[in-house]
Amino acid sequence: MTEANELAGKVQSDQAPASEKPEEAIKSRKLEWMQKYIHHPGLMIGLTILLLLVLIAIAAPVLAPYSPTDTDLGNTLAHPSSAYWLGTDQFGRDVLSRIIWGSRISLQVALAVVFISLTLGTIIGAVAGFAGGWLDRVIVVINDILLAFPGFLLALALVAARGSSLESVVTAVSIAFTPRVAAVMRSVVLTIKPRLFIESSRAIGMSPARILFCHIVPNAMPPVIVVATVSAATAILAEAGLSFLGLGVQPPTATWGNIISDGNATITTNPLISFSAGLCIAIAVIALNMLGDGLRDTLDPQMRRQTGRIL
């Protein structure tokens, strides 16, 4: 009798989720996703650091004690003090103020590059994988040619051809990273296209465009979002490298790359200028990589076991 009662209890517990209301099922699913995010330390640490950097960039006019372009030739290369927490550069500009304002440029470049490369790469990769045929072959050939060049080298050539400006940096880095997003999107679309729910959509007469953008693309976005997040970190490095070489945002605009370039002349006597900007770049890149790893583990747990790192 006891065993029968236990068996009946198990059956009732197994059948309980089936009788759950749709609203409760959606709520429980949202709670499950929130628990996954909260219990992933890397994702939370990366997201927290990134949010702090964004807040610092937004509040730069309030947080920065001085203007990033104001010079004081009577107080050049000053060591850290209560007036200048990180000292001054060879033009008497406050290093801390320039670093705070420089975060704006780096985050603007990262955000713009992610938006442009994610949009273009998603459309190009989705159309190539879904259409197939000669269009797919042409896109793959062009994509492979662009991928054959290192991303930074391609961005360097494009900036040199267009001229040094913030718009040129964003355009060049976006063009360099779009093929990577397109390649990932195409490969995921090819795995989703033969699935049963796609064939069922075709059978009921759904248009190809609706199938692609309403069913395939949303299901293919998780790995693409991860690639875009990691690309944001690479975009910050690319902008800093281009500015360091004098091909990025031009002085006296404060960027982390320009600060490193300015401090390079006094690296032996006052290394804090270059070190502080380099540390900010490292923190931002590490935070974005931690965020990308966390999103990968949360959105697609099998991706880490099957393919390792995406980039």
State the predicted function of each range.
Residues 45-49, 109-113, 139-142, 155, ...:
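Hydrophobic core positions of alpha-helical segments in small-molecule transporters
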Residues 147, 158-162, 173, 188-189, ...:
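Glycine-rich helix-loop "coupling/hinge" segments at transmembrane-helix boundaries
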Residues 93-108, 112, 132-140, 190-194, ...:
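Amphipathic cytosolic juxtamembrane alpha-helices at the membrane-cytosol interface
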Residues 1-122, 126-127, 134, 148, ...:
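Gly/Trp-centered helix-boundary motif
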Residues 85, 89, 119-123, 129-195, ...:
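Generic hydrophobic transmembrane alpha-helix motif, especially the helices
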Residues 57-61, 155, 159, 226, ...:
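Structural signal for membrane-spanning alpha-helices in multi-pass inner-membrane proteins
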Residues 53-57, 159-160, 173-180, 230, ...:
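Alpha-helical transmembrane segments of multi-pass membrane proteins
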